[in-house]
Amino acid sequence: MCASFSPTLDSRSRQLLRTLISCYIQNGEPVGSKTLAQQAGLDISPATIRNILADLEELGLLNSPHTSAGRVPTAHGYRMFVDSLVQMQPPSEDDIRRLRVEMAGGGTQALLGNASEILSAMTHFVGVVSAPRREQFVFRHIDFVPLDARQIMAILIFADNEVQNRVIEPRRVYEPGELERVSNYLNAHFIGRTLADIRTTVLCELRKAKDEMEQLLAHSLDLASQMLVPNDSEDIVVTGQTRLMALQDLSDMDRLRELFEIFASKREILQLLERTINAPGVRIFIGEETGMVSMEDISLVTAPYAAHGQVLGVLGVIGPKRMAYDRVIPLVQVVAQVLGTALEPPTMP
């Protein structure tokens, strides 16, 4: 959960803070009172501006670098900016149409890769997308292939045309004809349902006494219960890591090396994304809000993506704290919506 930081400010202070942070994001240089007098659109003297800036610094919203008379935003300043001051610049209708074209068609993995690439290319930062758990996807077809006397391969085909193979060791030996009858039964009764939903039904039915079931049903449910053991392993798609090397804001090579190690392991990034999966809308972590020392100079903007009303995963952008939040926030939101629509399986016949 990202903490809000919103001290009470009058309208002049809010306007000066908004203008200063916007100028700093654009130019990367400390902003002085003369620049603010020209850019803020307020009819006040430079002396009054300096007094207001001193008050904002006292509140912990700004900081004065030793080598400059200007000021830069702190993490608290950025937090207040994104919470209440930023003026969003959403993608144009043409951009949104292009996004839909680029995200049309293809299997799940291809769509996740496209989304990550788009986020990285349009922001020049790092794009990340967490992959959905397969248990959330819609079942279309299954085949069983005997590997040997003790092992069977279950070939699962989902509504998005992705294929997953699972090797199981059944509790009894099945003849090829039996496997065909079992697969026919499962295909007839469970098409169009998620694996999680199928598992719930199967486990419920298995609680009934076996002598109350037809033999085919018992065998089908027995195989299905073994095939549908939950697989909690998830992955994320990360694109554009090397873009961070060109950023002046991230010039600490030791910190950058630690960040690349996090990208390589993916575990910490995945845990961070999971913190936002049940939160509606865009979530923003600024610096130490990530809970990781190596990301104290980093911001993460995330949004969940969903299909047919069910949240499947989270995507986002990782970049420096000095990022164009006015463009990145609505872009992340739009890409999440477009990805969710692209992942919606077609209506089953």
UniProtKB/Swiss-Prot annotation:
InterPro entries in alphabetical order: GAF-like_dom_sf, HrcA, HrcA_C, WH-like_DNA-bd_sf, WH_DNA-bd_sf, WHTH_HrcA_DNA-bd, WHTH_transcript_rep_HrcA_IDD
Keyword Oxidoreductase attributed: no
Transcription listed as a keyword: yes
Gene3D superfamilies recorded: 3.30.450.40, Heat-inducible transcription repressor hrca homolog, domain 3, Winged helix-like DNA-binding domain superfamily/Winged helix DNA-binding domain
Parts forming coiled coils: none
Record-annotated membrane-spanning stretches: none
Biological process annotations from GO: negative regulation of DNA-templated transcription
A Pfam family assignment: HrcA
One function term, GO molecular function aspect: DNA binding
Keyword annotations of the record: Repressor, Stress response, Transcription, Transcription regulation
Superkingdom of the source species: Bacteria
Its job: Negative regulator of class I heat shock genes (grpE-dnaK-dnaJ and groELS operons). Prevents heat-shock induction of these operons.
Protein family per UniProt: Belongs to the HrcA family.
Descriptive protein name: Heat-inducible transcription repressor HrcA
Species this protein is from: Xylella fastidiosa (strain M12)
Taxonomic lineage: Bacteria, Pseudomonadati, Pseudomonadota, Gammaproteobacteria, Lysobacterales
Gene: hrcA
